[in-house]
Amino acid sequence: MEEKLNYWMIVAGGGGKVWSLFKEENIACIDFDSNLSSILDYKNPQELNQGKQRDKFIWKFAHDIKKDDYIIATTGVKEILGIGQCVKPYYFDESKKTFKHCIGVKWLKVDGGWEYQGKKGVRQTINWDRNKERINLYESILNGTYRKNIEKVVMNKNINDYLDI
């Protein structure tokens, strides 16, 4: 049986400040200003000791994003910057000063400018998106049929059904 691909929204730094890093290095990465080593060295999320919500974000990033899953890079709650597919599962890049927690990504669309409305009041670092209408929207971006005025309505609909992790 073929494994279902998932769609993960990952903020490219507040306001997209590390989007250029994502594109240049073909990665998506997260950083919580902590001294955590590789997440794979920990037995459970509680051992991370970064706070309950952060523990879940970091743990899911390292353990649940799988090869071929779709990665939607965003600015936070307003714009999709790019869409790609995971080509390398979680790894820890000790050579970086920040944003050491990484996954390899083949960026398929990097034009940006696709509007959406994220879930207000919730940290948007990582979300597993299960909304079929938004997934259809991501697919329209990938296949070149995205239409801003029509698709914007879809992105604003049912914004509360992200799976917050």
Segments predicted by a language model, with ranges:
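Compositionally biased, charged N-terminal/linker segments
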Residues: 1-60, 161-164
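ATP-dependent helicase/translocase motor core
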Residues: 3-6, 112, 116-165
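Compositionally biased, intrinsically disordered low-complexity regions
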Residues: 15, 86, 106, 115, ...
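Short conserved micro-motifs at the rims of enzyme active sites and ligand-binding pockets
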Residues: 19-23, 95-96, 114-120
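Charged/polar, solvent-exposed surface patches and flexible loops
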Residues: 20, 60-63, 88, 148, ...
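Short, low-complexity, polar/charged sequence segments that are solvent-exposed and flexible
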Residues: 27-32, 90-94, 103-104, 122-129
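Structured alpha/beta reader/binder surfaces that contact nucleic acids or chromatin modification marks
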Residues: 36-113
